[in-house]
Amino acid sequence: MLKSTSLAALLAVALVLPATADTIRVGMSGGYFPFTFVRQDTLQGFEVDLMNALAERTGDTVEFSTMSFSGLIGALESGRIDTIANQITITPDREAKFAFSQPYVYDGAQVVVKLGNETEITGVDSLRGRTVAVNLGSNFEQLLRELPFADEINIKTYESNIEQDTALGRVDAFVMDRVSSAQVIKESPLPLALAGPPFSEIQNALPFRNDAEGLALRDRLDAALSEMNADGTLTAISEKWLGLDVTVPAG
């Protein structure tokens, strides 16, 4: 359980702001290293730094709420939060529902297997006849279902622990973004390996409700994102947490 002092810090970021500052309610899972995670009772990561930096520029405060990833979209739709900072990939279905900021992470979908199996499963084409895990509510399930051989893949959805079940051999592979996959392999003791190159480019951004209030907030934060991109702040946050700059398209 989070310590009370730390919990208070999570719920209201202490910034010296004018009395007219708005509170931006930000939803995240708190379990997607290195973007949003809890360590020593403190919520931290790429997304936390990003939202704090945006709020500092716009003169707002940030109120973080953690919940299961699969519940984030519903929380945004119902008005319980104002946006989601959890590597939300822009997809046609999501664009039909929400207004998105400009992308701030460019990445790719990655197959990950138990260490030693990367010679047998060499990428997405090797997933025929395999059981593959994805996080419930993520866009990676849809990417797999759009493959021409999707009916040959047993797709299994998880709230969490896809890495552990892959390492234990309960599933043959999992699919996640390449950046997070590489960080999990680097930081955790689990015997995992990347299997082949990314098989789909993804662009991640902040979603907002497509109403007057949501659009106004999107435009305000988008302007701050442009400033952070221009002055190197986005790059610095990326290099701090990932060791490389993923805030611009590859190439």
Describe the function of each predicted region:
Residues D22-I88, A96, I155, R220, ...:
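Extracytoplasmic small-molecule ligand-binding "clamshell" domains
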Residues S29-G30, Y106-V113, K186-D222, L244-G251:
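Periplasmic-binding protein-like
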Residues F64-G74, T119, N154-L168, V179, ...:
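Short helix-initiation/N-cap motifs at beta->coil->alpha
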Residues G71-G74, N86-A96, L143-L147, L168, ...:
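A ligand-binding cleft/hinge motif common to bilobed small-molecule-binding domains
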